[in-house]
């Protein structure tokens, strides 16, 4: 009777060992992978695209900011003056271009023809006078200087006649295509300067680029600012991302889209929910700021986890425990 008892006890022991091992394995599986990370710090330095004197700031540190909200303004006066000058430049260029397209009026052509006749008469007189002076110089009646003066007057009258003839020819044939093209280019340049002046004036108003919380107010009204200098620093509140790191052994468990549970010290019994949004393709050494029981020399891959039910209690930079378990996969 002892032998069957021993066999029974042995079988019972084996079953107990198997059951215990199964329970231990399943509990380990339910525990799943645990990682440690932080809520990403995401900030935007807000600045004017143009420089000038800061006229006003409408927000203070800690304020809740909405996208499109007016945050502050520069002194508009210099940019309003530049806009007026640009508008005048467009008007002048437009008038010149229209004049080039329209050509010359009949009255202008008639005036140019009269100028040619007058210049022709003056040239004829100067030429005849020069001819007479040549005869007198040959007979030694006048000096060489008198003859040179007559020749100079003749040449000047000839140049005046040539200029009047060219002007009349231009009036009759209209403006050259090159001149019209140049006038059109000048008009387009003036319009571009006007558009830039309008944009510069618009950029004297500082607009919030996104929703968030104001972290820093770096300057005060009255300050002279250069273009691009930081005026305000905005902390972006949505979406909330968690940055965590995983080693190569567990990399296969971190597929994008997988559901995750996120625990904080402030609410250990009420996890946040998230999804893996990005897995870095490049390995790096574990950053010193990350809490991890593993060796710092391990190569790890960065994860971005998108929190789907974030609230105001989840602050940027806050440490977070990331759980990959059965519950997270099925919630």
Swiss-Prot record:
Residues 107-208 form a coiled coil. GO terms for cellular component: periplasmic space. Its main location: periplasm. Keywords: Coiled coil, Periplasm, Signal. Residues 1-19 form the signal peptide. Pfam families: HlyD_D23. PANTHER family: EFFLUX SYSTEM COMPONENT YKNX-RELATED, UPF0194 MEMBRANE PROTEIN YBHG. Belongs to the UPF0194 family. This is UPF0194 membrane protein YbhG. The gene is ybhG.
């Amino acid at each position: 009777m002892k032998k069957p008892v021993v066999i029974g006890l042995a079988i019972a022991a084996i079953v107990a060992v198997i059951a215990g091992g199964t329970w231990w394995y399943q509990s380990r599986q339910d525990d799943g992978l645990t990682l440690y990370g932080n809520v990403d710090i995401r900030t935007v330095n807000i600045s004017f695209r143009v420089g000038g004197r800061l006229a006003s700031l409408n927000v203070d540190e800690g304020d809740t900011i909405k996208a499109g909200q007016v945050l502050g303004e520069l002194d508009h006066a210099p940019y309003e003056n530049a806009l007026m000058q640009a508008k005048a430049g467009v008007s002048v260029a437009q008038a010149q271009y229209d004049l080039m397209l329209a050509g010359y009026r009949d009255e202008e052509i008639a005036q140019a023809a009269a100028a040619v006749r007058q210049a022709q008469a003056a040239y004829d007189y100067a030429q005849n006078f020069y001819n007479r002076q040549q005869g007198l110089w040959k007979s030694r009646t006048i000096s060489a200087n008198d003859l040179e003066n007559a020749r100079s007057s003749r040449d000047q009258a000839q140049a005046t006649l040539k200029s009047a003839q060219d002007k009349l020819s231009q009036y009759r044939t209209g403006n050259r295509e090159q001149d019209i093209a140049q006038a059109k280019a000048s008009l387009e340049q003036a319009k571009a300067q006007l558009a830039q002046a309008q944009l510069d004036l618009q950029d004297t108003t500082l607009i919030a680029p996104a929703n968030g919380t104001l972290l820093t107010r770096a300057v005060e009204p009255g300050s002279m600012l250069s273009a691009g200098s930081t005026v305000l620093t905005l902390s972006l509140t949505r979406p909330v991302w968690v940055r965590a790191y995983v080693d190569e052994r567990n990399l296969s468990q971190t597929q994008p889209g997988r559901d995750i549970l996120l625990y904080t010290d402030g609410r250990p019994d009420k996890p946040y929910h998230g999804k893996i949004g990005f897995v870095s393709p490049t390995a790096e050494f574990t950053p010193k700021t990350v809490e991890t029981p593993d060796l710092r020399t391990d190569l790890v891959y960065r994860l971005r986890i998108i929190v789907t039910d974030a609230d105001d209690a989840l602050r940027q930079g806050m440490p977070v425990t990331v759980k990959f378990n059965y519950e997270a996969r099925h919630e």
